[in-house]
């Protein structure tokens, strides 16, 4: 299915002059910094269809004659075309706000054709500098990129929290005033996975965003296990939520093993075909302990474990399950793991392992925007 980037015009691609907010002469045509170069890269480096959607209040009336609009608009279009930026469609609504027209943003009256099954609106984006652009994304079932140039309109509007509905907050995936950041976001889409694993022993839900901010939401029923999984999220930079309902009244084994299996599966799915990743990835000290974790997302599971624990449990987690956790992760993530730790304090040793594990993952999944067509293997597949 075809994904689309719906792009606002005034305030997003070109400056919106004040106070009349009308680009009605060539003298008023001023491109937003980096918009042309970023749009060229988006057009050349991604598969999104580019669609312009703009409200032009009263176009064709005495307050905004057509002959003052088209010269600047056509110059803008020819400038983009000269940089290999070709819009599949340009939708212009001419109504005033008080007309309450369904074709005026955030209405979707001009855009009904994109609800056809051949379009993937769920993975499409609306880029604009107004909250009406965010609402348009909600109405389309797409995601929103709120463009916020310094002292721009969106910066003022977004300060009014009451203007943002919960649906709008959920729709916004990026707020920025930098077109280069928009390009990188579209070129490097978030790598996410949702895994649900349900057996007679455990019910597990894992939500993973490899390109998150290190946010953690752990509820396994085992406090120390939650603490270790928090380290994975924090030190890998991934957003990770794990909710488990396990048979802890019998034993901790199923909860820990099945969580690792689901987590490994989430990483395997989120990595996709692994193009552009570093693939390999850590020595990490914690007080007297030193952990070494090497990882290779090779497509082949293997675990080398050189770690000895003298206590039966640390917190409420059996130490015998440490090996089992990483073995299960390796099995479903299809990765090689080489883990070694030295130290005296048992808590420090296992926490150092989990932190080093997270850092190794962070290194291995890092993408190079200039290597996205390259697979880090001479075999041609991972």
Swiss-Prot record:
InterPro entries: HAD-like_sf (IPR036412), HAD-SF_hydro_IIIA (IPR006549), HAD_sf (IPR023214), His_synth_bifunc_HisB (IPR020566), HisB_N (IPR005954), Histidinol-phos (IPR006543), IGPD_sf (IPR038494), ImidazoleglycerolP_deHydtase (IPR000807). SUPFAM superfamilies: HAD-like, Ribosomal protein S5 domain 2-like. Binds 2 Mg(2+) ions. GO terms for biological process: L-histidine biosynthetic process. One of its GO terms (molecular function) is histidinol-phosphatase activity. Its EC number is 3.1.3.15, 4.2.1.19. Pathway: Amino-acid biosynthesis; L-histidine biosynthesis; L-histidine from 5-phospho-alpha-D-ribose 1-diphosphate: step 6/9; Amino-acid biosynthesis; L-histidine biosynthesis; L-histidine from 5-phospho-alpha-D-ribose 1-diphosphate: step 8/9. Mg(2+) binds at residues 8, 10, 129. The active site is at residues 8, 10. It is found in: Cytoplasm. Keywords: Amino-acid biosynthesis, Cytoplasm, Histidine biosynthesis, Hydrolase, Lyase, Magnesium, Metal-binding, Multifunctional enzyme. Residues 1-190 are annotated as: Histidinol-phosphatase. The keyword Lyase applies. Its cofactor is Mg(2+). Pfam families: IGPD (PF00475), PNK3P (PF08645). Residues 191-382 are annotated as: Imidazoleglycerol-phosphate dehydratase. In the N-terminal section; belongs to the histidinol-phosphatase family. In the C-terminal section; belongs to the imidazoleglycerol-phosphate dehydratase family. This is Histidine biosynthesis bifunctional protein HisB. The lineage of its organism: Bacteria, Pseudomonadati, Bacteroidota, Cytophagia, Cytophagales.
């Amino acid at each position: 299915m075809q994904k689309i980037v719906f792009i606002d015009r005034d305030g997003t691609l070109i400056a919106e002059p004040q106070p009349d907010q009308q680009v009605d002469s060539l003298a008023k045509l001023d491109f937003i910094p980096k918009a042309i170069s970023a749009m060229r890269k988006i057009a050349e480096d991604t598969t999104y269809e580019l669609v312009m959607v703009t409200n032009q209040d009263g176009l064709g009336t005495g307050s905004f004659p057509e002959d003052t609009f088209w010269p600047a608009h056509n110059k803008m279009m020819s400038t983009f075309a000269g940089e290999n930026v070709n819009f599949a469609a340009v939708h212009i609504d001419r109504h005033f706000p008080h007309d309450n027209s369904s074709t005026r943003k955030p209405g979707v009256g001009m855009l009904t054709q994109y609800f056809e099954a051949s379009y993937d609106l769920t993975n499409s984006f609306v880029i604009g500098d107004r909250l009406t652009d965010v609402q348009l994304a909600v109405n389309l079932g797409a995601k929103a990129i709120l463009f916020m140039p310094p002292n721009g309109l969106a910066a003022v509007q977004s300060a009014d929290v009451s203007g943002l509905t919960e649906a709008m907050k959920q729709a916004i995936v990026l707020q920025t005033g930098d077109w280069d950041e928009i390009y990188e976001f579209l070129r490097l889409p978030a790598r996410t996975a949702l895994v649900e694993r349900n057996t007679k022993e455990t019910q597990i839900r894992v939500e993973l965003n490899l390109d998150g901010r290190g946010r953690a939401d752990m509820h396994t029923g085992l406090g120390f296990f939650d603490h270790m999984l928090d380290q994975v999220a924090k030190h890998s930079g991934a957003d990770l939520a794990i909710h488990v309902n396990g048979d802890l009244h019998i034993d901790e084994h199923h909860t820990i093993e099945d969580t690792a299996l689901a987590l490994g599966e989430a990483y395997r799915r989120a990595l996709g075909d692994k193009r552009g990743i570093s693939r390999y990835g850590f020595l990490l000290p914690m007080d007297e302990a030193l952990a070494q974790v090497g990882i290779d997302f090779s497509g082949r599971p293997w675990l080398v474990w050189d770690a000895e624990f003298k206590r039966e449990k640390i917190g409420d987690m059996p130490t015998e399950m440490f090996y089992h956790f990483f073995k299960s992760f390796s099995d479903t993530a299809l990765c090689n793991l080489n883990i070694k730790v030295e130290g005296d304090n048992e808590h420090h040793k296992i926490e150092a392992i989990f932190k080093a594990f997270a850092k190794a993952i962070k290194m291995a999944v890092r993408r190079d925007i200039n290597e996205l067509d390259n697979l880090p293997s001479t075999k041609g597949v991972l």
